[in-house]
Amino acid sequence: MRYSKYFIHTLFEVPKEAETPSHILLLRGCYIHPVAAGVYSLLPLGHRVAEKIKAILREELNAIEGLEVTMPVLNPAELWKKSSRYYDIGQELFRIKDRKDREFVLAMTHEEVITDIARQFLRSYRHLPVMLYQIQTKIRDEARPRAGLLRVREFFMNDAYSFHPDFADLDAYYPRIFNAYLRIFTRCGLTTVPIEADSGIMGGTGSHEFMLESPNGEDRFVVCTQCDYRANTEKAQGLIPPVKYSGDAPPPMEAVPTPGIKTIADLMRFFDCPEDRLLKTVAYEADGELVLAVIRGDFSVSATKLANHLKAVKVDFAPEKSLSARGLHAGFLSPVGLHGVKIVCDASVTGPAPFVAGGNAPDVHYRNVVCGRDFTPFDAADLAEVRDGDRCTRCAEGILRIRRGIELGHTFKLGTKYTAAESMDATYLDAAGNQQRVVMGCYGIGVERLMASAVEQWHDEGGMSFPYSIAPFQVILCSLGRKPEILEAAQALYERLGAHYDTIYDDRDESPGVKLKDADLLGVPIRVVVSQKLLQKGEVEIKVRRTGVVIVCPRDELLETLERIVADLQPSFEGLPFMPE
């Protein structure tokens, strides 16, 4: 491919709307073009990268007996109503009507459609297990698209769905997809951290996210300094040291006037107590029901953990009007003396220690409040957001450190969420002729997100540095100068290189500086240069984009030298945390 005939229009200026490295560089390198907020066209270079990622996905999923399908983006609303997702999902789901006023949705995932297929065809134990996957457009009405391809409204997703006769078979299959994902990300040049993930209201018996550690990531996860514990902060637990209290039975609870006390710091000074002796009461609405979450003052409530414990679809902070209707006052909330309100306590507040709590009235607090004596919670659970520096629950020795990351993929033991009788009702007949419920797993990877993540991990001040396996071209050939002998030699090299490598030849009538800077910006892994000086010596110059190493070799040894370089650019699977299969 000749550069002069290709669709490449690089930008020198940084686009004002771009902030993250991948967004800036993919725009500057003419890989993508914005159409609307969170909607991008993949230009020829970006399309080539996406297609190479898709090829890796297909190779690895086919290797574990996956079968590719294509499902429609336009789904009848009836299917989504059967699974309840039509009602459970908020504004991020596009809902539309056709000219006959029939309701449809634009699919953000395809559990409903694939389960409908399964219940029609997978009717016998002889048909199971099976894994079906697709690489298809997904559409989500993201409230705040950001960071270029990292959070968009339309994208390609590889979503896979496995169907099993029982949970044991799903458990046996799960390591195969987990390991395939590790190979996919490694082949794409990405350093991945598999972490334990939150299963949410979906239930099931296991879930993992695959994270790329990045300061531009939206997700947070913890890593233990001593053991292999890795978990999303929505799931992670830290060891919570109990409140030190060794006195006699606490004195009776008493109300104390606290005029002008508004903050935690004010309370600590007023009552002369540490933060862990305060009760923090946070009001939520869980599927429309008022719930009070009670936690120690030195911790914060995780809304995700609360939702999971309550098996609630939607949990939000309770609005002021909801509190006012019950005579409650934000800032002075307390679990004491309330009736008809569900109270869930974090495990950190159970025990004999007395606490300071709100008085459920303006400018009043209670002192010497004891859980179980002065109020009775509906339930106790782990509600605490993990903190950087907490002790590890897995080994009890290590310290948990919080990292930021980009979620590359998610594997999930879905169970019977969609195959249950109250949902899509997918069953089969076992060997004895008895009807059984189909068990599912679901798995997903965003294609454009992998592209952007590769740039986030592999870039420098000069531009991108794409991994060899997914780069739009493997080699870029630059001819420096317009003398006939240079162009003739470059043409000969282009033909030789093109027979072995995916090559683009920069044949433009541009200065050496422009060509070399563009080569760095585009991130092609290997650059080969022909110039007058090199030609006189019968040599060519090779630069490895990733390392910056420059090699000058005889022209007749070019292919042999490239072979060694390419071997060094291949991914290594050594040390990856594969699951036993």
Curated annotation (Swiss-Prot):
It comes from the Bacteria. InterPro entries: aa-tRNA-synt_IIb, aa-tRNA-synth_II, aa-tRNA-synth_II/BPL/LPL, Anticodon-bd, Anticodon-bd_dom_sf, Pro-tRNA-ligase_IIa, Pro-tRNA-synth_IIa_bac-type, Pro-tRNA-Synthase_IIa_type1. Keywords: Aminoacyl-tRNA synthetase, ATP-binding, Cytoplasm, Ligase, Nucleotide-binding, Protein biosynthesis. The keyword Zinc-finger does not apply. Pfam families: HGTP_anticodon, tRNA-synt_2b, tRNA_edit. It catalyses: tRNA(Pro) + L-proline + ATP = L-prolyl-tRNA(Pro) + AMP + diphosphate. Its main location: cytoplasm. It is found in: Cytoplasm. GO terms for cellular component: cytosol. One of its GO terms (biological process) is prolyl-tRNA aminoacylation. Gene3D superfamilies: Anticodon-binding domain (3.40.50.800), Bira Bifunctional Protein, Domain 2 (3.30.930.10), YbaK/aminoacyl-tRNA synthetase-associated domain (3.90.960.10). Its EC number is 6.1.1.15. GO terms for molecular function: aminoacyl-tRNA deacylase activity; ATP binding; proline-tRNA ligase activity. Homodimer. Belongs to the class-II aminoacyl-tRNA synthetase family. ProS type 1 subfamily. Consists of three domains: the N-terminal catalytic domain, the editing domain and the C-terminal anticodon-binding domain. Catalyzes the attachment of proline to tRNA(Pro) in a two-step reaction: proline is first activated by ATP to form Pro-AMP and then transferred to the acceptor end of tRNA(Pro). As ProRS can inadvertently accommodate and process non-cognate amino acids such as alanine and cysteine, to avoid such errors it has two additional distinct editing activities against alanine. One activity is designated as 'pretransfer' editing and involves the tRNA(Pro)-independent hydrolysis of activated Ala-AMP. This is Proline--tRNA ligase.
